[in-house]
UniProtKB/Swiss-Prot annotation:
<dbReference type="InterPro" id="IPR000456">
    <property type="entry name" value="Ribosomal_bL17"/>
</dbReference>
<dbReference type="GO" id="GO:0006412">
    <property type="term" value="P:translation"/>
</dbReference>
<comment type="similarity">
    <text>Belongs to the bacterial ribosomal protein bL17 family.</text>
</comment>
<protein>
    <recommendedName>
        <fullName>Large ribosomal subunit protein bL17c</fullName>
    </recommendedName>
</protein>
<comment type="subunit">
    <text>Part of the 50S ribosomal subunit.</text>
</comment>
<keyword id="KW-0694">RNA-binding</keyword>
<keyword id="KW-0809">Transit peptide</keyword>
<feature type="transit peptide" description="Chloroplast">
    <location>
        <begin position="1"/>
        <end position="89"/>
    </location>
</feature>
<dbReference type="GO" id="GO:0009507">
    <property type="term" value="C:chloroplast"/>
</dbReference>
<comment type="function">
    <text>This protein binds directly to 23S ribosomal RNA.</text>
</comment>
<keyword id="KW-0689">Ribosomal protein</keyword>
<dbReference type="GO" id="GO:0003735">
    <property type="term" value="F:structural constituent of ribosome"/>
</dbReference>
<dbReference type="InterPro" id="IPR047859">
    <property type="entry name" value="Ribosomal_bL17_CS"/>
</dbReference>
<keyword id="KW-0934">Plastid</keyword>
<keyword id="KW-0687">Ribonucleoprotein</keyword>
<keyword id="KW-0699">rRNA-binding</keyword>
<keyword id="KW-0150">Chloroplast</keyword>
Length: 205
């Protein structure tokens, strides 16, 4: 049993292994098979044989190949495996405003805000909700500019009040006929009393 003062090193570990005689290059002979591209290396029989390493991410005899002079080349003895992995891009810039609600409640909230904004022309809500509802209001106005029956039915499926849809399709072509976007405006205001949430007005241009 080693004493506490003994310093363990790689040389001590290598000395505990059985000695292996090095194979000189002159003792190797090559025999050509039927194909000239395949070469076999015939080694002389030795009393101590090295076991083949596992064909995976395993070192090829790390203790035997590691020397005290070149201790940093341990990672170079690993075999490289190509597992056919693919790298996919991340979803940068595709953030969905959750508004602290599940999907069904979030959609109902955005439908209600869109209906009230198209009905009154200006509403006051939180800044996050105003920025989230702006996309849907612009989409409804773009549908009204198209004026087709299919777009009208799509708007009826999103806006809660039927009269607002008919008034929207009748007024939008004259009001926003020359405008290709930017139908709403967000104006920041004082934060809400109580929880200090940032508030804003969103209105039709």
């Amino acid at each position: 049993m080693a004493s506490a003062s003994t310093t363990w090193s790689m040389s001590c570990l290598k000395s505990a292994l059985p000695s292996i005689q090095p194979i000189s290059s002159s003792s190797l002979r090559f025999s050509c098979g039927p194909s000239p591209s395949r070469l076999r290396i015939c080694k002389p029989k030795s009393s101590s044989r090295l076991l083949h390493s596992f064909v995976g991410l395993a070192p090829l005899h790390p203790l035997l190949s590691l020397s005290s002079q070149d201790s940093t080349s341990f990672e170079h003895s690993f075999t490289v495996i190509d597992n056919g992995g693919r790298v996919f891009a991340m979803r940068h810039g595709r953030k969905v405003p959750k508004l602290n609600r599940p999907p069904d409640q979030r959609r109902a909230l955005l439908r209600g805000l869109t209906t009230q904004l198209l009905k009154h022309g200006r509403i006051k809500t939180t800044k996050a909700r105003a920025r989230a509802v702006r996309k849907y209001v612009d989409k409804m106005i773009t549908m009204a500019k198209d004026g087709s029956l299919h777009k009208r039915r799509q708007a009826l499926g999103f806006i809660y009040e039927k009269q607002i849809v008919h008034a929207l399709f009748a007024e939008v072509p004259d009001r926003y006929g020359e405008r290709n976007g930017g139908y709403t405006r967000i104006i920041r205001t004082l934060p809400r009393r109580g929880d200090n949430a940032p508030m804003a007005y969103i209105e039709l241009v």
